[in-house]
From Swiss-Prot:
Function of the molecule: Catalyzes the oxidation of either pyridoxine 5'-phosphate (PNP) or pyridoxamine 5'-phosphate (PMP) into pyridoxal 5'-phosphate (PLP).
Species of provenance: Cronobacter sakazakii (strain ATCC BAA-894) (Enterobacter sakazakii)
Residues annotated as binding substrate: R14, R15, E16, Y17, K72, Y129, R133, S137, R197, L198, H199
GO annotation, biological process: pyridoxine biosynthetic process
Protein known as: Pyridoxine/pyridoxamine 5'-phosphate oxidase
UniProt similarity note: Belongs to the pyridoxamine 5'-phosphate oxidase family.
Residues annotated as binding FMN: 67-72, 82-83, 88-89, 111, 146-147, 191, 201
Cofactor(s), names only, from the UniProt record: FMN
SUPFAM superfamilies: FMN-binding split barrel
Catalytic activity annotation: pyridoxamine 5'-phosphate + O2 + H2O = pyridoxal 5'-phosphate + H2O2 + NH4(+); pyridoxine 5'-phosphate + O2 = pyridoxal 5'-phosphate + H2O2
UniProt KW keywords: Flavoprotein, FMN, Oxidoreductase, Pyridoxine biosynthesis
Keyword Oxidoreductase recorded: yes
tRNA-binding is among the record's keywords: no
Amino acid sequence: MSDIDHLQQIAHLRREYTKGGLRRRDLTETPLPLFERWLAQACDAKLADPTAMVVATVDEHGQPYQRIVLLKHFDERGMVFYTNLGSRKAHHLENNPRISLLFPWHMLERQVMVTGKAERLSTLEVVKYFHSRPRDSQIGAWVSKQSSRISARGVLESKFLELKQKFQQGEVPLPSFWGGFRVSLEQVEFWQGGEHRLHDRFLYQRDGDGWKIDRLAP
């Protein structure tokens, strides 16, 4: 059987979800403690990149785009990630701050989806995080004009070596085009795989100063 024949069998690829359910008694009054518990369990399970999340934004024509970004902080104010401010996602968020995040913890048969609005972080927050990064990562932030077209990888590697030489003494300065966003928590949905495709879904939705919690059909 050829590779193409194998690929044509994808309609038959499936498995049962058997790792447990999510019941109302398992829920917390607000979504953050449950998210924190699930994230800790994802870390304890040694999942690859447990803080990786799909970030979805929309351009001026209504075309959605997605990419994987790492969560770097979260609290009651929202979820934080950092990026090049000249990137496609940053331009999208300037025009339309609506955003969706998705944490796909496949091995635990779980996912968490967050929807809200993104706002730029303060310079103080960005500087503090930037200088906590490995030095080579700080230099790497200077190298790439994110999402621009380049002729070859060698262009990036040459620029990296040039800047590494330039910044060999003292601190690497924060690029003016590098920053971060905080995503407000307006809706948070928890999904747990269930047997016979009877998955458990609970939606937390802002309701004044509190949260409304609904079970959703799978």
